[in-house]
Design a protein with these regions (language model features):
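Metallocofactor- and cofactor-centric catalytic cores in central/energy metabolism, strongly enriched
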Residues: 1-179
């Protein structure tokens, strides 16, 4: 009999404090909603765990080092909800030793053209933040899986079984019979 660990994947959202507390509260709420919906979909092999919004290089580095030492954390999923300066990620990315997935998505599936304003534009810059983040990761030569599309789309959710391929092989249970 094989023992399978109860792995978890951390969902880390990038932003910055430039946009203020209200925007950051919305970013956190949107991230929590995405995590809940991904877990409810039943399409992912393991639980996705929400982590507080990463807004500074110190917090990014601390979070990634915590992921490195957490035996249940099998990998990190990153999404940049707003513009998140790429230079803020460099130290954390250099030290990250877990598999990495870049979820390149937007919170809103549709752009509200009738009501769009600068607050909406500032809060929903994933297209900008994700591209800059992807650029720095590429420049650093860090391997990662990139999934592009709206997070609620079943096709996007089904692309995430890459998580299984990155896990270490299961070990036999110490009490199992081996012939």
């Amino acid at each position: 009999m094989l023992a399978v660990k109860n792995y978890k994947f951390w969902f880390c959202t990038g932003s910055q404090d430039l946009y203020g507390d209200e925007c950051l509260a919305n970013v956190a709420a949107h991230s929590k909603e995405i995590v809940a919906k991904l877990n409810e979909s039943g399409k992912l092999p393991f639980e996705v765990v929400w982590k507080p919004t990463l807004i500074t290089n110190e917090l990014i580095r601390k979070t990634f080092n915590e992921a490195n030492t957490d035996d249940e954390c099998a990998g990190v999923i990153v999404w940049c909800h707003t513009f998140s300066p790429a230079k803020s990620w460099i130290l954390g990315l250099k030290e990250l030793r877990k598999p990495l997935l870049h979820l390149h998505t937007q919170y809103n599936e549709e752009i509200p053209y009738d009501s769009i304003d600068m607050d909406f534009m500032n809060e929903n810059q994933a297209a900008h933040g994700d591209r800059e983040w992807g650029h720095i990761v590429t420049r650093m030569g860090i391997e990662r899986k990139v999934v592009v599309g709206h997070w609620s789309d079943p096709v996007v959710q089904e692309k995430q079984p890459w998580l299984l391929r990155l896990l270490p092989p299961p070990r036999p249970h110490p009490l199992s019979y081996q012939a």
